[in-house]
Regions:
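Flexible, acidic/Gly-rich N-terminal and inter-domain linker regions that tether
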Residues: 1-54, 58
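Conserved Radical SAM active-site core
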Residues: 29-31, 37-40, 47, 52, ...
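The canonical Cys-X-X-Cys-His
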Residues: 60-63
Length: 133
């Protein structure tokens, strides 16, 4: 079993190197400030955006919806695009788009798909999404 997992990991690494090289890029959402000898965050470089505002149906013990209060709200696709335009003008290189969970654990991102595509294509921002638990 362990040998099988190791082989799968080795194959995954090989595919990764073939497609992306050996460079690993890390993006750090900006909802909290931190500084190390290698990196310090800036509030505008990689902001976090919530498509549900402060709403979360689950209120899980690890967060209780508090993380949502650190995120910028964008409740419609148009709001999301306008917010990303503003963030780009302020120096953002990308953003994390997520939100509170629905009762099934999903984040309602479907209706934002076209706007997210526009943010990537027209604004050139790197976009990460967190789709739920």
């Amino acid at each position: 079993m362990a040998d099988e997992k190791l082989l799968k990991m080795e194959e995954a690494r090989k595919v990764s190197v073939e497609n992306f090289g050996k460079i690993i890029r890390f993006y750090a959402p900006s909802f909290t400030y931190y500084k190390t000898s290698f990196y310090s965050s800036t509030p505008s470089a990689f902001p976090t955006i919530s498509v549900t505002g402060s709403y979360c149906a689950l209120k899980c013990e690890h967060c209780n919806g508090i993380v949502l209060n650190t995120m910028l709200p964008a409740l419609t696709p148009a709001e999301l695009f306008r917010l990303c335009e503003k963030l780009k003008m302020e120096g953002a290189v990308g953003c994390l788009i997520s939100g509170g969970c629905m009762p099934d654990g999903s984040v309602p991102l479907g209706r934002f798909a076209e706007a997210i595509g526009l943010v990537k294509r027209e604004l050139g921002l790197t976009v990460f999404v967190h789709t739920g638990i």
